[in-house]
Amino acid sequence: SKERWIESSNLGKAFCKNIRENWDYKIDTNLAYPIAIGKAGSYFKVPLEKLLIAFLQSFVSNLINVGIKHIPLGQSEGQKILINLLPVIEKQANINKISQINNLGSSAFLSDLSSMYHETLNNRIYQT
């Protein structure tokens, strides 16, 4: 959806701005967040597997955090979920590490449809 594109672009710009201001790396500031993470990881010589695990864990943690705040899930249950997902995150990072660019992508059809609907609502807690 439009808001997911905006979110990824804004996160990328903020991340790159932080990199430019705090380290001697003049990374392009007009990058989507996942691309910015990859470029910075390469520049700072972060091993690909560790970079993928950190990125995926951050993504999953953000989703769990929404659940903690709005289900309500509770922090202890959220931590248990994250711990239980660590092997899945590591497995997915290993798959991504050996994948060719044409094999990478994502599909979250129902989530994307919900996002498109959600961005047209008047009263929302979060951007989509």
Describe every region a protein language model picked out.
Residues 58-128:
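C-terminal auxiliary extensions adjacent to catalytic cores
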Residues 1-73, 80-83:
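Amphipathic alpha-helical interface segments
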